[in-house]
Design a protein with these regions (language model features):
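N-terminal acidic, glycine/proline-rich low-complexity segments
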Residues: 1-421, 431-434, 443-445, 483
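A structural signal for beta-strand boundary/capping segments at domain termini and interdomain linkers
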Residues: 388, 464-468
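Short strand-edge motifs at loop-to-beta-strand transitions and within beta-strands
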Residues: 423-427
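Exposed beta-strand face motif in extracellular beta-rich ectodomains
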Residues: 447-453
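Long, low-complexity intrinsically disordered regions enriched in Ser/Thr/Pro/Gly
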Residues: 450, 470-475
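Short, solvent-exposed loop/turn segments at the edges of extracellular beta-sandwich modules
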Residues: 457-464
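Low-complexity, Pro/Ser/Thr- and charge-rich linker/hinge segments at domain boundaries
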Residues: 477-494
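Ser/Thr/Pro-rich, acidic low-complexity intrinsically disordered regulatory segments
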Residues: 492-504
Length: 504
């Protein structure tokens, strides 16, 4: 039987402020149900009902309250399954955070002549709070509440203060759902802003649809396991108990908004300040990575290559999310069991990953000379329920790449097991010719590629649960070894020069 003191801890909770067009269709309610199951990992600071292009003339805070009423019937059970220092928030506390944005579409609710709504006022207060930690604004609908606040900050604060306040913002939106989103990115390019960009309402082109949209939008057919988001699976595993019963049947795709907070889940996989690293919430890169011009902070979709359930390889932006579907759906189902069952003995809990003595969920970082080896030891890892554990180490190559052709640019780590279970491994850093070369000129670099190694630890409970640890290996080449010898008169000044002899 698990001892609650041995369960996961969350010493650094991200501050979260949700803007939701709940009731335009069922998926916002679905996402809110799941969000509440993770709410002990977050410092929730606002739950604001907003409009969108799909619900232009009203907002529905009452429907947030309905979900919180269901949560009230589950929170005592949930608190039996968390470390005593990191309890779930009470329903009453969350109820005080429910506010409204303007019951009108986009810019119709924004302007210097329009008073701030109570939702915008709360957001402004939380941005101005004397707290250094960033505020994550998760946008499931339109962004006019955020636009109201940014306009107010610009008009009422000095330029220096306004810049400091915007620097505290971290925004993740589910595409653009009103006419203020593009304006925000244009007027305030310094705001950290994750959003898929595509033609208006062409959601099948967006990364976030990888959560569940493969059949509806027709992408990557045969890759993702659709059974884990089917209506039958949801009925059997999610729509049960006091909270799960508030999860409505889906209409288009389930939980389109969920990637915004899957990105923040503290499971050892992601780094919320680095969207390019990848996590359950997808993988995103700066749309302008230059150090000139606007120097904007808009992040948009990247792609991953993933082997699907049919054994074929799929590469897409949606794959950056659906590649994790089995694990995040199992995680969801396990938490639903917590919500209806107070017994630790009859439910499953996450493995606690410890690598080289560290149980932090932040990436473990090394500098290693090209051609050298490092040893990693996860033998102290344990399962609080006493389940058997499976250790899987693999290189996540895509985050190391600077362009599309990953296999051309990113060298492979050597991974050697030092015991039968793979708790301990030796990692061989590639030689400088592979890990510390300029992409185009092929001249040696003192500081080469940042290589990503992922440890997945999966238990034998029901459903199986997975925890992670990311290891970052910064390759170095202090003596500037290697480099491509050039023939007399030969120059490598363009990518075509570097790749002319490359074969995949």
């Amino acid at each position: 039987m698990a001892d609650s003191i041995r369960l996961q801890t969350f010493p650094s909770k991200p501050r979260v402020f949700v803007l939701t067009d709940i009731s335009n269709e069922p998926d916002d309610a679905e996402s809110l149900v799941r969000y509440l199951l993770y709410s002990n990992q977050f410092q929730t600071e606002g739950l604001v009902a907003v409009s969108s292009t799909w619900m232009k003339n009203k907002v529905c805070p009452q429907d947030i309250h309905k979900i919180l009423d269901a949560y009230a019937g589950a929170v005592d059970n949930l608190n039996k399954h968390t470390h005593p220092d990191y309890p779930y928030p009470s329903a009453n506390r969350l109820r005080t955070l429910v506010k409204s944005g303007p019951p009108m579409y986009g810019f119709a609710g924004v302007g210097t002549d329009k008073p701030l709504t109570d939702g915008a006022q709360l957001l402004l207060e939380r941005i101005k709070a004397p707290i250094e930690d960033p505020l994550w604004v998760l946008v499931w609908g339109g962004t006019n509440v955020l636009a109201q606040v940014l306009l107010s900050i610009r008009d009422q604060c000095s330029a220096e203060e306004a810049t400091k306040l915007r620097a505290k913002l971290r925004v993740y939106t589910i595409s653009d759902q009103d006419d203020t989103s593009a304006w925000i990115r244009t007027q305030f390019p310094d705001v950290f802003y994750i959003s898929s960009i595509h033609g208006w309402n062409q959601y099948g082109l967006a990364a976030w649809t990888g959560i569940s949209g493969d059949k509806y939008y027709g992408f990557d057919q045969g890759g993702p396991d659709f059974s884990k988001v089917s209506k039958q699976w949801i009925k059997e595993n999610i729509q049960i108990g006091p909270l799960g019963s508030a999860y409505p049947d889906y209409l288009f795709i389930p939980e389109g908004d969920t990637p915004t907070f899957l990105y923040l889940i503290q499971n050892g996989l992601g780094d919320r300040e680095h969207p390019e690293y990848g996590s359950w919430g997808g993988r995103y890169a700066l749309t302008d990575a230059s150090d000139a011009g606007q120097q904007g902070k808009h992040y948009s979709d990247m792609s991953d290559s993933v082997i699907g359930i049919d054994g074929k390889t799929y590469r897409s932006n949606q794959a950056t999310i659906w590649r994790w579907r089995n694990t995040f759906q199992n995680d969801f189902a396990a938490r639903i069991q917590w919500s209806l069952n107070p017994s630790l003995a009859s439910t499953n809990h996450h493995p606690i990953v410890i690598v080289n003595g560290s149980r932090s969920q932040k990436p473990l970082q090394f500098e290693a000379e090209a051609g050298s080896t490092i040893e990693l030891d996860a033998s102290q890892t344990y399962d609080p329920d006493g389940d058997d554990l499976t250790f899987t180490w693999w290189q996540y190559r895509e985050p190391s790449a600077t362009q599309w052709l990953v296999q051309f640019e990113v060298s492979e780590l050597g991974i050697e097991k030092l015991d039968t279970q793979g708790k301990r491994i030796k990692v061989m850093v590639p030689e400088p010719e592979k890990s510390c070369m300029d992409l185009i000129s092929r001249t040696p670099l003192a500081k080469g590629q940042l290589l990503h190694l992922i440890l997945e630890v999966t238990d034998s409970g029901t459903p199986t649960l997975t925890s992670y640890r990311r290891v970052l290996i910064q390759s170095t080449n202090k003596d500037l070894r290697g480099g491509k010898p050039l023939k007399e008169g030969e120059e490598l000044n363009a990518i075509g020069d570097a790749m002319k002899n490359y074969t995949d």
